Amino acid sequence: MPNETLQNQIASLPENPGVYLMKNAQGEIIYVGKAAVLKDRVKSYFVPPSRLTPKTCQLVSQINELEYLITGSEQEALILELNLIKRHRPYFNVRLKDDKGFPYLKITLNEKWPRIYITRSMADDGGRYFGPFANTRSVRHTLQVLKELFRFRSCNRTEPEKRSRPCLEYDIHQCLSPCTGKISKSDYDHLISQAILFLEGKQDQVLKLLIRLMNEASARLDYETAALRRDQIASIKEVIEGQQLAARVTGEQDAIAFAQEGDLSMVQVFFIRRGKLIGRESFCLQGTREEKPGDILSEFAKQFYHSSTQIPPKIVTQYPVSDREILEKWLSQRRGDKVHITAGLRGQPKELINIVAENAREQLKQARIKNLSSSVTLTDALAELQTALGLSLPPQRIEGYDISNIQGTNAVGSMVVFENGKPQKAHYRRFRIKTVKGADDFSMLKEVISRRFGRVHREDAGESFARLPSLMLIDGGKGQLSSVKETLDKLGLEGQAVIGLAKEFEEIYLPHKSEPIRLAANSPALQLLQRVRDEAHRFALGYHLHIRQKSGLTSALDGIPGVGPSRRRLLIKTFGSVAGIRQASFEKLSQVKGINQALALSIKELL
């Protein structure tokens, strides 16, 4: 029952649209809400507890005081509510986790020679902003791609000072040096326009333009410019290929879905422009326990698009959103054109939303694993493993194994080590497969296990190989586990504890047991095993890609007539890598000993 002061405040509430603030006994704002009719909305909280969710009951029990602000419309109330939630971050509101200062990309169009850089604040200063991005890693990656493609200046001066010679950025092909007149103002402005088109998702337009410029440069025998355009074209094609979606999509739209566990929801947003996925971001929402799916999506949409610089004409959501009409009006006003919000419940939109939702679930799982040590103690996870697997002691040392290859080529194996639940990267080991031909993962696992345990008693075993694990984890199911168990038995290690973790259903296989074990999705023990398994996969894949890149680099040079082993070594020594050779100018290639102008031209054309 509300206190007398609170009862009087409720009784005096107006029947206008507005925002209400609920405070506890300490005067802290614990909830902010909006309403078309303030009196009706606030009174709906003070009903018998049986008609409220447990979360709302807890909120009502803490309300000691009410404040309200009248607005001219429900749309104005929505904007005010957003600002108050962002400022006060009330405990009972659904809110973006760590939403203070999401990063943006800024293009300084107010400067003579515009720059592109990362910022955490927006100002009405004539600049163009893109974002927000969920984290600095994704925005840095985007900036790196832009830098490699368009080579804009990155010096901090608003006006680059005149220089007699270019700086290092020019020498390493990261800037076109406007400060020394290496590029005209019109060409530089054209370059920035291409970067904007790229960020808007109009890569096809940029591609057509670059192909035309490459052909024009080639026709006038300007091979250096033609090679630059060719490299840009190849990079953009690679980006476009990575933007294809399994679902058929058209036009411009954002697709939003989430996965929830308790009070935390992970929201995934796919940004689709011209039928291609140009980016995706994940955001954490707090305070979502017992909230309806439509309310969660509505709260996210309000908070995300409040700070977003790009609003598409269509937004597809996992469930029908609450307050759809008022949201559409507000978003249409912000965009300057009509915005439609629709739920992807059937057909092509459902296909798309299913993909987004699967990514949201994966992101939530990774967040759980990442936060394992802070949310539950590793001691509890190890103790649960001991019980679930029937071990005599908690597994103090866990070793994880995985294989990575493509149709048997560049095959490698990995071994990662976790002690007391924490990775020990100094003990990680990698294996290049030597005895197995073709795609035979079982035999590859046997080779890795034989090489690892064959060194246990050798003097040169080292600390990592000299110790036996408390538990071995194999990435795979019954077949992989049987291969490893057979190898261990041959090595006289019949008592070695070993399990397989199959990815599809996260089932745990044990030797001599026909049926797998299934632990709860939020089990600390399962989360620890997933972390070991995923780390083994990451480590193996990284080594595999490294070998593939090395083999790919040498074959690229081998295909150029006149470049034999000695010239290849000299080129690599001079420029550091094939990427460095590819970026080198015609003049610099011609200066390398043994490389005449004709051969330098062949290298530029064929590499």
Swiss-Prot record:
Keywords, A to Z?
Cytoplasm, DNA damage, DNA excision, DNA repair, Excision nuclease, SOS response
Q: Which GO terms describe its biological process?
A: nucleotide-excision repair; SOS response
Q: Where in the cell is it found?
A: Cytoplasm
One of its Pfam families is UvrC_RNaseH_dom
Q: Which GO terms describe its molecular function?
A: DNA binding; excinuclease ABC activity
SMART domains, per the entry: GIYc (SM00465)
Does the entry feature the keyword DNA repair, yes or no?
yes
**Residues in the signal sequence:** none
Q: Where is the UVR domain?
A: 204-239
Q: Where is the GIY-YIG domain?
A: 15-94
Q: What does this protein do?
A: The UvrABC repair system catalyzes the recognition and processing of DNA lesions. UvrC both incises the 5' and 3' sides of the lesion. The N-terminal half is responsible for the 3' incision and the C-terminal half is responsible for the 5' incision.
Q: What is this protein called?
A: UvrABC system protein C
**Gene source species:** Dehalococcoides mccartyi (strain ATCC BAA-2100 / JCM 16839 / KCTC 5957 / BAV1)
Gene field: uvrC
